[in-house]
Swiss-Prot record:
Swiss-Prot/TrEMBL GO biological process terms: D-galacturonate catabolic process; D-glucuronate catabolic process; pectin catabolic process
Pfam family, one: KduI
Pathway(s) of this molecule: Glycan metabolism; pectin degradation; 2-dehydro-3-deoxy-D-gluconate from pectin: step 4/5
Organism of provenance: Paraburkholderia phytofirmans (strain DSM 17436 / LMG 22146 / PsJN) (Burkholderia phytofirmans)
Lineage: Bacteria, Pseudomonadati, Pseudomonadota, Betaproteobacteria, Burkholderiales
Role according to the record: Catalyzes the isomerization of 5-dehydro-4-deoxy-D-glucuronate to 3-deoxy-D-glycero-2,5-hexodiulosonate.
Protein name: 4-deoxy-L-threo-5-hexosulose-uronate ketol-isomerase
Obligatory cofactor(s): Zn(2+)
EC number: 5.3.1.17
Length: 278
């Protein structure tokens, strides 16, 4: 598991392209038949992915030792969204089907977790967010139809999109983790513009459905000190609470957002007018 230290805003604005990418970009989320994780000191979130192809992939109990516990979810909760083929997740001996564009929430205290695919020719790809937790809530799967949808934007501003809120208080209880998926309509390129920050939560964006010859320019930094990170398919960007988080693609794309922090109020944002950005 790779560890990333927290970076403050004064230091971040001194970084060059390579420095920004090393600090905030997770450039490989999936690896065949492996669990890949990145641990951020920012609100102690763990992000990563698992792609079971030839075999099921278990979360090793030894992983807990790297965070000072006996097993990963002894003091944590986990959310996963499947962006690949249909698959399943075994949670303490109970198998849960998780199809494409479906999610699963796994509560604190779960000891045995394994991920699998229904078809090795079209493997599941489970994108994961894991956060500290203080109590245990039930494991549950969430389909796209069960997610809370919100359509925003306009074709005239190239930002027509639908936000599917999978792991949010109006759908199911969690300690602090929130996750969802935003799908841009064809011809729309911008996400989250006008942009915002939220001092009370950090966020991670995971971009996918990005064409091989396309890219997304992810905007970050303080509103008066903006920077960008060029992102390709199936890459993630860690966004501290002091940073804006927005993006524009050369084509439409989809991304998963995950938040942890003080609260779970989706609308608790500090909005920034486009004219005030620098």
């Amino acid at each position: 598991m790779e560890v990333r230290q927290a970076i403050n805003s004064d230091y971040a604005k001194t970084l060059d392209t390579d420095g920004l990418r090393k600090a905030f970009l997770v450039d490989q989320v999936f690896e065949r038949d492996a669990l890949k994780l990145t641990y951020s000191h920012i609100d102690r979130i763990i992000v990563g992915g698992v792609m079971p192809v030839a075999r099921a992939v278990e979360v090793p109990s030894s992983l807990g030792k790297s965070i000072g516990v006996s097993y990963l979810l002894e003091r944590r909760e986990l959310g996963a969204i499947n962006i690949g083929g249909d698959g399943w997740v075994d949670v303490d001996g109970t198998r849960h089907t998780v199809r494409n564009e479906e999610a699963i929430y796994i509560g604190q205290g779960t000891q045995a977790i394994a991920f699998g695919s229904d078809d090795a020719a079209r493997p599941a790809k489970f994108y994961l967010n894991c956060a500290p937790a203080h109590t245990s809530y039930p494991t549950r799967t969430i389909s796209l139809a069960q997610a809370s949808p919100q359509t925003l934007g306009d074709p005239a501003t190239s930002n027509r999109r639908t936000i599917y809120k999978f792991i949010v208080p109006e759908v199911l209880p969690t300690c602090q983790l929130s996750m969802g998926m935003t799908k841009l309509e064809p011809g729309s390129l911008w996400n989250t513009m006008p942009c915002h920050t939220h001092e009370r939560r950090m966020e991670v964006y995971f971009y996918f459905n990005v064409a091989d010859d396309a890219a997304v320019f992810h905007m970050m930094g303080e509103p008066n000190e903006t920077r960008h990170i060029l992102v390709h398919n199936e890459q993630a960007v860690i966004s501290p609470s002091w940073s804006i988080h927005s993006g524009v693609g050369t084509r439409a794309y989809t991304f998963i957002w995950g938040m942890v922090g003080e609260n779970q109020v989706f609308g608790d944002m500090d909005h920034i007018a486009v004219r005030d950005l620098r």
